[in-house]
Amino acid sequence: MNLPKFIKDDERLFRLLLGDLFPSLELPISEYGVLQEAVEAELSKSKLQKHEFLMQKIFQFYDSRLTRHCNMLVGDPMGGKSTAWKILAAAQSTLCKRGTEGFQSVTPIVISPKSVELDELYGAYDLATFEWKDGILSTIFKQCSEDEKPTEKWVLFDGPIDAMWIESMNSVMDDNKILTLINGDRIPLTTSMSLVFETQDLRVASPATVSRAGMVYIDAAELGWECYVNSWLDRTFESDEETKELHKNFFTKWVDKVLKFRELSCQQPVPVSDFNAVVTLCSLYDSLCKVETSFRKDSLGGDYASVAEKMFLFALVWSIGATVNDGSRKKFNACLTDIDAIAPATNTAYDFYIDVAKNDFIPWDNRVPVWRPQKTMTFHDMVVPTVDTTRNSYVTDTFMKSKVNVLLIGNTGTGKTILAQSMLKDLPDTFSQLVVNFSAATTSS
């Protein structure tokens, strides 16, 4: 039960220590048989890669669940934590449907504990009527406890762990397996129920909490962004091996070098992980392919490869390169031109967009509309289009048309609100708008 907690280097050291202490003992190799076949089938069904590291973590989670009713999946975002439990749950459910002995179907119930108040999570007395009102967790526990079906109920806590809410779970996590509420209710954890905590780290978790749970650490660096890209290529170019290979070469040529340069030589006001940056790159390229209707392989013919690489470079600039500050943009552009002269030599790649018909980079200046204020406009309604507003609007609009979430980041007074408001005004009637102001004091109610 110790190996799942270690990073790769520590795992190697641990095995060497075991070899020194028990020189004549060989660790048995676990075989999972039908479960491994089911896991591989679910990965293929979900268009995911059968990565050795991911499968290892899935089986470690499975082994940990056999011995503990409470387990923690720990690791950075986009590292495969959710994928691990989802694939295992689906595989077990599939085996149960086939009638395979020893496996039950799984019903996962996901809770975000930090998104609600403590009273909303566990329950509280109404101060006006002094009546008890169950919270989200107590309601779920009662429903699962009363359910006599053999189906496994996994109660998943997705979010940061801290003493504010986790300490009340200690009696459930230990051998007592009882949730005790402040009104005196004691809800037992049945044999078909188990707890799973999915969190980034355990910095503020007490030793008492950590010691009560099985631990599986999933290192996002071990999985790497290449795994995601391969799955994206399989989904996007499923029936076109030639185009898939072309785009795979784009990633090989550009992405790794650019990511390393960004980490070593550029400053990011809001640091974004390599994995998230590559996910954004794939999303933006997908969105550009949908928005730019003239970007079609059959219509472009022999120019397709050239246009596709320019489009890929544009998406790379506004995904991986979008997080660097103004002072680092020239450095970032120099990195691009060092890799290939396809990148614009004058100004920076941030100053150009792609004209698919001309197969060339065109300055954003050419796309800035001529604007004159209307007599009826008030001063606060006037938004003078510039290169910045034009290119930011284009990228934002491209994402929105493809229903991809957008996050605008910048200092106060840089035009984020104006950009968002102007985009909302131009949305078609198929969209509805809701403006919500958030602050540190905002609650779930």
Please report, for each region that a protein language model flagged, where it lies by residue:
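Conformational switch/transducer regions in large eukaryotic molecular machines and scaffolds
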Residues: M1-S445
